[in-house]
Amino acid sequence: MKKLNLTGVLLLLTIITNAQFNRAELKVNGLTCSMCSYATEKQLNTIDFIDSIGNDLDHTTYILYFKKDADINSDLIKSKVEDAGFSIGSLIYTANFTNLKIENNYHLTYKSTLYHFMNVKSVTLNGDVRLKLIDKGFVSDKDFKRYRKMAEKYPCYQTGKMPDADKVYHLTLI
C-alpha cells in the first residue's frame, strides 16, 4: 500500500512539474475608451501572480505575464475585470509543457488548481501550448452553450466542481 501511495505522489509531482503557465491573453468585453482600459488595467495590476501587463487596445485584449512558478487563480482575474465594470470575452493561457501526454477528459493539477481537458485528441504536449478556458464567465454565453452541449457527460462542466476538489477549470487546445 505504501508503494502504491508513493507511486501516486511521484506521478502527481511529475504532472505538476511538467507545466509552467507563462502568460494569458485576456479579452475584455465592453471597453470603449482609454479610461475603461485604465480602470481595468489598474485592477489587474493588484494581482500578485501577475508580473507585467501588455495591451492591445484595438482588440480590447490584455497580455498578462505571470511570475515564474506562480499559482494562477482564474477566478481572481475574472473578479478584477468585473470589479472594473466589465466582463471576460475569453481567457487563453500559454503554458510550457515537457512531454505531457493528454487525451480527452484528462485532469492536470498545476500548483493548487485542477484543470480538466475537454474536446481534445490524444497528444503529447511539448513547448508553448495555447489553452482556452471554456467555463461560464470566461467565454461568451453562446460559446458556453456550445461547450455545455458537448460536455453533457461531464457534470463538473455544469457545476465547476469535482466530487474530490473545490474547483475545476475546463480547458481545450487551440
Language model segments and positions:
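Helix N-cap motif at beta-to-alpha junctions
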Residues: 67-72
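Bacterial Sec-dependent N-terminal signal peptides
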Residues: 1-23
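Residue-level detector of family-conserved "landmark" positions at structurally sensitive sites
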Residues: 6, 54-55, 91
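Start-of-domain marker
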Residues: 23-65
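Short amphipathic alpha-helices in soluble, non-transmembrane regions
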Residues: 40, 74-85
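Thiol/selenol-based redox catalytic cores and closely related redox-interacting motifs
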Residues: 86-171
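Processing junctions and N-termini across compartments
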Residues: 13, 27-30, 150
